[in-house]
A protein has these predicted regions:
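Conserved catalytic core of nucleotide polymerization and phosphodiester-bond processing enzymes
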Residues: 1-198
Length: 198
């Protein structure tokens, strides 16, 4: 369970990011609720920790997150500041993965699939259509950057979760077990004998 938070923890620990050791220790001690762990670290309610966690993992902007939290802009800013101060590895991982996407034009999932960032946009803030490199150069000149890199963590985490789920489905199939349905990070199967489920 909690596939995406575990992947965030995995990637943050690979990079040795500050603060992730507390989550790893909790996991190793049998505490498997990432949102509660983060709630305790940041001293904020679990529901707010979960909303912020998932919002950041899925590339939500501050305004959308504020609306999801149902708080004023000032309260949202305080929550974000507290969260990032007490749970620094999430923002550090987001920034690291965004830089990788900007520099390399891709991120690789757990099993090596490439998530590409092939479109470009002007460096300045505004509403612009993302374009292929040559078209962006022709329209905006050399002041361009890769578009949508703010979604890099989402692509890494969701893509890696998909890798894991698909691999599990293949392994089940090899064992003669056919999943009936896949919902998020869950595979539902039927067994004839309860011992098969173990």
């Amino acid at each position: 369970s909690q596939q995406e938070p575990r992947l965030v923890t995995h990637y943050a620990s690979l990079d040795g990011l500050y603060g992730v050791d507390e989550v790893l220790d909790s996991y190793n001690n049998g505490e498997a609720d990432f949102h509660q762990i983060v709630s305790d670290m940041a001293n904020i309610p679990r529901s707010q920790a979960k909303t912020i966690n998932l919002g950041l993992f899925y590339g939500m902007g501050k305004n959308k997150l504020q609306a999801e939290l149902g708080v004023s802009k000032e309260n949202a800013e305080d929550l974000f500041r507290t969260y990032h101060d007490k749970v620094p590895f999430v923002k550090m991982l987001m920034e690291s993965v965004m830089r990788r996407a900007q520099d390399r034009g891709r991120v690789r999932t757990l099993l090596g699939r490439r998530c590409r960032f092939d479109l470009w946009e002007p460096n300045q803030f505004g509403i612009h259509k993302a374009l292929p490199h040559e078209e962006a150069l022709a329209e905006h000149g050399p002041g361009i950057k890769r578009a949508y890199t703010y979604k890099a963590l989402n692509r890494l985490i969701q893509g890696s979760a998909a890798d894991m789920t698909k691999k599990a489905m293949v392994e089940l199939h090899k064992e003669g077990i056919t999943p009936h349905i896949q919902v998020h990070d869950e595979l539902d199967i039927s067994v004839v004998n309860p011992l098969e489920a173990a």
